[in-house]
């Protein structure tokens, strides 16, 4: 049975000191969570603090990006070996902000996904359409292109270590949210596409999160949908009390 996972994406927020304070507040709030996975995606500068503060807890740590290469003359970049050395377990790849601001395409993202898997890191592959694409009725085409491109040469066996996150770009940080029915419709399409690519057994076991203005008020209704297996949470993951509510909604749905 696939796992419900609630992941936070801090983006370019929180110093190491602020991260330590956050985890000291979050840990007691979610200590009794047994069924849902908990992940925090932290900026590179806070990763060492994050892995140290969560050691021995039920919280796992993700990087928000990485370079596909192990080392070399890539000024300003961080490699999978560096992330592993810090105790990071997951890495968020293909986020719409990386696609838009840093011009990452499916080919670049695919190289990162394959590199993460080769270095025993679990990629959280983000996919999703822009508002004009939804209005043009091309949501499924966009999502299919991103999944097929992002997972090129990824084997069925490796899919056990891949998480997908559907984030409609028009709902990220805008306060707009896909309705539970809208989100479920796309998640069901994604599940069907994974079935076509890898077979039903693999598809049924892949965690597909919803992202896009998920918060403590709407999380339970979204996660209750058949094919929504948790969330990738932005702004609400910066506040321990709000994030804990979302985590507990995921935990309740996972029982």
Map each language-model feature to its residues.
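Active-site loop-to-helix "anion-binding N-cap" substructures in soluble metabolic enzymes
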Residues: 1-255
């Amino acid at each position: 049975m696939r796992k419900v996972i609630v992941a936070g994406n801090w983006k370019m927020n929180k110093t190491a000191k602020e991260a330590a304070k956050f985890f000291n507040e979050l840990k007691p709030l979610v200590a009794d969570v047994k069924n849902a996975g908990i992940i925090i995606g932290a900026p590179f500068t806070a990763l060492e603090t994050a892995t140290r503060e969560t050691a021995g807890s039920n919280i796992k740590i993700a990087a928000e990006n990485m370079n596909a290469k192990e080392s070399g003359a890539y000024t300003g970049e961080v490699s999978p070996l560096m992330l592993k050395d810090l105790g990071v377990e997951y890495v968020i790849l293909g986020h719409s902000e990386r696609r838009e601001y840093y011009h990452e395409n499916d080919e670049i993202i695919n190289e990162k996904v394959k590199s993460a898997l080769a270095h025993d890191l679990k990629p959280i592959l983000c996919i999703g359409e822009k508002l004009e694409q939804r209005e043009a009725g091309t949501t499924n085409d966009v999502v299919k292109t991103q999944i097929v491109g992002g997972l090129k040469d990824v084997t069925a066996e490796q899919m056990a270590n891949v998480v997908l996150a559907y984030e409609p770009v028009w709902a990220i940080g805008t306060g707009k949210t896909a309705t539970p029915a809208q989100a479920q419709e796309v998640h069901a399409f994604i599940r069907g596409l994974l079935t076509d690519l890898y077979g039903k057994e693999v598809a049924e076991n892949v965690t597909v999160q919803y992202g896009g203005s998920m918060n403590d008020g709407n999380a339970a209704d979204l996660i209750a949908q058949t094919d929504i297996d948790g969330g990738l949470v932005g702004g609400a993951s910066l506040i321990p009390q709000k994030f804990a509510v979302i985590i507990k909604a995921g935990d309740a749905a996972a029982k």
